[in-house]
Each structure stands twice: as C-alpha cells, then as structure tokens.
Curated annotation (Swiss-Prot):
Position of the signal peptide: none
Native organism: Oltmannsiellopsis viridis
Membrane topology annotation: Multi-pass membrane protein
Gene from which this protein is expressed: ycf78
Protein name, per record: Uncharacterized membrane protein ycf78
GO cellular component assignments: chloroplast membrane
Family per similarity comment: Belongs to the ycf78 family.
Amino acid sequence: MFFVSAVKDYLEVLSNITDTLTGTLSFDTILKSTLLYLATSTKVFVSYIISFEWFRNISYLPIIAPDLSKAILRENYVLDTPLSNLFTFFDVPSYTSNKFVLGLLNSFFLAIPISVAHLIAFRRFIIQGLPAGLTAGLGIISGQVCFIGAVLFGVRSLVIPWFATEPLSYLIGIFLILTIIYDMAHESRIRPINLSETPLLLKIFGLSFLLTWTEQSSVFQYLANVTLGNQATLLETTTVKTDGQFLLTHISYLLGLTAGNILFTLLFGFLLLQLINQVVKFSNLPYSLCVRNLNFGILTFTLALSITSIPYYGFDYLLTAPLGFVSQDQSLEKVSLRTNLPDAIGYLGQLSESKYLDTEVTPFDRGTYLTDFATPKTYESLNYQGEYFWNSRLDRSASVTQKYRALEFNPKKDSESEIPEQVGALSPDSQANSVSPGQELSENELGLGTTKTNKQVLLNKLDQNFSRNSNPSYANLLSEVLDYSFNESFFTTSASNAPQEVALQKIEFNIKQKYYSNPLYKALLNFDIDRFISHQPVAQRLNANQEKQLFENRLILSTYYDTLRDYRLLPYSSEFQTYFNGPKSYANRVYNQQFKGTLNVVRRLFAIDIEGDSAGRSTSNSVLKFDQPLFNNFKDSSLSVYHEELNPEAVRPTKKSPFLENTSPTPFYAGWDNIQRKFIVTNRLLAREAAGNEINRASRNISSATSALTAKDYTSLGDTVKLKFTSWPDSSSKGGNSKGVNQLSLPFISVPQEKFTQVVSSLGLEDDDFGSASSTLKLPPNIKKMFEVCQISIPEVFPPKRGGFIWP
C-alpha cells in the first residue's frame, strides 16, 4: 500500500510539471524532479519516524481499515484524513447566503449560560452590579470572537502553539477559577463596582477573556456540532475566488457572531434577573438573604463544574497525550492497569481484621461473597442498610478504642523477669516492700495459690501467641473449603447463651427493628425484593397449585436423596443432619439458586410455608421461590423445558424416519479395496471391475427420547435390512434372469454388439461366460476409461459435489 501511494505521488508530481511547463520534458528536468521528490520523501519519512506519528496511526488502524477495504474495491487508494470530516475547505461556495445572518443565529449556542465563565459573569452582574456584569460579558464575547477569528483566518502561529500546550492550558484555567472563587469567598463585604474603578474592571475583563480560552468544564463540548449552517461546526469556512471576497465573507460572519452573542447574552441575563425577582417576590424572603444564598449556590456550582472536568485529564492522558492519543482512548483499553485483581490467597485485610472491612466492593473487584472470614457475609449483609449498620458497628467504635489498639501492633515483649509479676508469684523482698504496715495478704496475693511454675506459664503464653497468630490462616482455609449454607448454630459457640451474648442479641434486634419498622425503608426493601423476584417471565409463570406441587415434589426428592447418604447409618444421624443442615451439594438442594447472594434476609422476612395459615386452611398464594426456571418461548417447538412432572398429558407422538437416506444421486457400489484391504460400500465414482448393489430397506420407527419403549419399537425378523449384490458385467441372457436384472434401479450402459468381443477381452474374460455375441451386455457407467478405450459413446455423468463416503 505504501509503495502504491509513493508511485502515485511521483506520477502526480511529473504530471503537474508537464502541465506547468510548455513543450516536452527533458531528461534533466525529470532527473531534478525525481531527486527533489526523493529528498522530500526522505525528509518526511525521517520526521514521521522520529515524531512517533506512526504510533498514532497504528491506533487509528481500526478506523482506517474499512476505508482501506473500500479503497481497494474502488481501485482508489487516496484516503481522507481524520480531520476531513471536521473541516471541509472544498465545499461549493454559496454566494447568495447571508453569512451575517448565519453568524447571528449560530451565536445563540455561544451565549447559552452553561459554562463557568458565564456563571461567574452572572454572579458579578447580580452581586457586583451592572458595570461588572457587562465587563465580564464583554470579556467572554471578545474571547470567543478572537478564537473563532484566529481559526477562520488561519492564524496558525497562535492556534497551534496554544493547543500544543495542553493540558497546561487546562491547568491555567483551573488555577484562574480557583483564584476567582477564593477572592469572591473572602471578600470583606459584598458591594457593587462603579465605573470609576477602571483597574478592577480591566482585571475582570482579562479574567473572563482568559477563561474563555482555558476553561473546559462546560456543556459546550457536547454542543460543538450544533449549527444552523451546512457545515459541521460553528467554525464556518467557505471558498471564494478573490482575497476581497474571503475577507468580506468571514468578517461578516464574525460580525454576526458578535452582534448575536451580545444580543443573546443580554437576553439571558434579563431572563435570569426576572426569574430571581419572581422568586424573591413569592418566597417573602429578604432580598439580602436571597442574594447571599444565590452567591453561595453559584460559587458551589462553579467549583463543582471545575472538579467534574478533572477526570477528563487523567494520569493516563498526561502520559499518552504527547504520543497523539486522546482522553479515554479506546486503543489503550487493553493496556490499562487492572483494578479488579482478586485476592487469590485470601489474606487481604487480615492485619486489620478487628475492623469491619466487609464492604460491598463487587463493582470494583467482582469479588465473591462468603469468603476470607470465618463468619458468612452475604449480599444482603453488605447492601441492606439494616443488616449493614449492625455488621459495620466496629467502624463507628474505632475512634473510641483507637488508643487501645496500639498495643495490638506494638505488643509489649514478655520476659521471664516479668512473669512472676503477671501471675502474682512475687519474691519475698518485693512482697515486703510492697506491703504497708497493718495490711494482711491472702494466699492468692502471696502467690501461694498458684501451682504453675514459671516455665509452665511461659509455655502457656507461647501456645496462646501461636494460636492467636494462626487463627486468621485457619479461618481463611476454612472459608475456602466450607459452604456457608450451614445451620446458624454451626457458627455459634457454647458461649452464645452467655449474658453478654443475650444482651448483644437484644441490641441487634432493636437496631434492625428500627429499620424494618420505618415505612420508607420497608417500602424500598419490599420493592427491591419484589423487583428481583419479578424477573421470572410473567406470561409463563406457574400458578399457586403448580408451585405447591413442585415444591412438595422437590422436598420429597431431597429427602429421598438424604436417605441414600452413608451417614444415615450412623447412630447419631439425626443430630448430624440437624447440625450440618442437610447435604452440602447444590444438586440436592430444594432450590438451586442461580444469582448473586443467598437472600438469607429474604428467608427470614418472607418465610416459605406450604402447610397453610394458622387455622390450617390451605392458602392459594404463590410460594416464594429462589430459582429461575427456563421456559420455551416458541410454542411450535416440540422441545420444551417446562416442568415435565406437572404435565399429565402424553408425550410427543413418534415420527417415522427412514433407516438410511441417500444424499447423492449416484448409486452405491461395493467391492474390495486393495489399498485399504477391506470390503467397502461407497457412492464415489470409482472404477471397479465388479461393483454394484441394491439396498432393499424397511422404514424404522424412531421414537422420541421422552416416550417409553414398547415391543412395537423393535424391528421384527421380517423387516431386517437386506443387501443384495449384483456382479458386473451382467448379461440379460445369462441364466434367464433378464426380468430380475431389468427391475434393478441401478443405471447401466448397454454395450453394442459390434463392441462385445472388444469389451469382454478388455475385462480379461472369455466370450463363453456370456454366451454368443448377440447377447446384451450391461456395464455400470463408472468405468469411463474402458468405454473411451473401446470407443463407446456414453452419456455424460456429473459427479456429486460432495466427496461421498466409504463404509464400513
């Protein structure tokens, strides 16, 4: 592709020289042009390599690839540049259109107050008076007109260097915005600005002018392609014949933009001022209070717009922008750093395990639930506020106990000299020095009640330290192996009935009851759960009786599976069943859940009950189900995944299909293959000295997989497949079997009588095998070579497009 473009450019250079110069081209002219072209091409190529422009073009390859394909098909190898759709310099000039009116209309999109510069100008107009507002508005209009004028008149020395400094220009804009907001927020008093304060007005004009060139936090970038003209953007460009027309056309367009921008800016300012007056009138609030609130709101919204533009210039853009990439370039998606690396080992957060780190982080790392901790943490525990408030209680108590947690990370080292002080086994000297006159010491205070030696105490502390340091790893290994669908008592200890645990359970109940008794929270929770359950297809949902029957059948099947377990033979099988809450295999569950989470909160709040109400009457409500059965949306389809245990009707009727279908119009031939050393049956057009067969087959009933097999499905002895082979060549006069041979449906070629002897000799046979020469000899049409040798005309046989098959 590069070579073709280079040759085409070289030929265009020679063609232009030929059109420019009169007369014929000399060899010297062609040589000079060739050398000049090679030198220019070499310079462009070196610059292309050094500037890394090739790296940017590689990123554009997915966009250019369709254009390359179209160019190859059209035999036109000249491609458009990426900017050809943005700036069209070769449109047909329209001398009748009024560029002033077009600029006047397009200025509406420039005057919409949706940028930070417009908000600051509007604040100056309301707070600092009319002169400050008009000065700020004129600064914005001047900045917009100067920028568009520089683009229209092609002032490259100003536009290209300015955009080449990006994102430095953006940082300058952020600095200006923060400076303006800081000055406005720290004003000693809010006062209007007079016309006599010329330096301050010039400062306001300059800041507004610079903000127009630097500020990017606006909606204008999303309205850049909105224009009332026939061009792609507001940057209207036209082609004219003379320089005078060029200046007149673009100056009239700029004048229209300026006049319309002033007009629409005044219009928007007047409308906003009337809106504020109406709000003050109907709110019955003092004007000073409304102005103070408006000042705070504008400054806050301005700062918010500035902050929202920061992600546009990310760290990746700062590194890749010099290489020609844009922000959030799709070409860099596969090379970005991964932010969803899972915790494969399971030790993330173990050092701070005392704090509650089980926060919902699945949008970031797509992590799994019920892992990395010794207690189950479900989807509801991390997302429902009533459950999450209780589980994250340690986070709120961290500030109170922070001074005591320093000992956990900087533990005090134990030594043998400190052990007697810890257990109370003090030395006599220390006891005598520590006892005041008249004080009596008990046996425990004297250390007489302790029977453990210092060595035993040291070993006990070593065991405790080892157990404390080993518990996190054991908990992780246990969390990876166990399934957290055990009974709740599996995770409780013998201290669960302690007074402290009972009091803690009461506190938990009161806290959760506060959430669940809130009408708004209750309505939102019901809406969330109902929305999840309603994901099942409504048109094909089971009715209440079918759900009840299905649930009962699943319970019976689950109980039956439980009876097949080996642990049923244990003497304490009932306690085993209660403790582990049934088998742990998902295939044996009553509900095979196919979604994120376990919905244990749903089980607690919306219990499943198929027995009926409190009076024993059967309810007709639907059973709450957690599985998502699949349905067949095509009624005409014979296959269905509908619950077959609920369908009392018969299965699909049987369908007759032939035992074997021939997919080729050619007949079958059988014979011995010397290469494969086996007897084969084939439909390929292969030459055989003796080949041919007839398959008389009977149709066989092939029942569906769902129907029960009966005796009629088996083929009887009389319907067995019969294979009858006929040897070739065949004579109708041999054995008086002409009638049987003529009934064959196999194609054959009748050998003329004058060729009888030649054909028989070519086959290596004797004439006596076929009687006299007047006998009719029939041969299969696949031995075409022998017919050509004997010069026998045969009809053309077209072989099948498929290669056929060889059996066995």
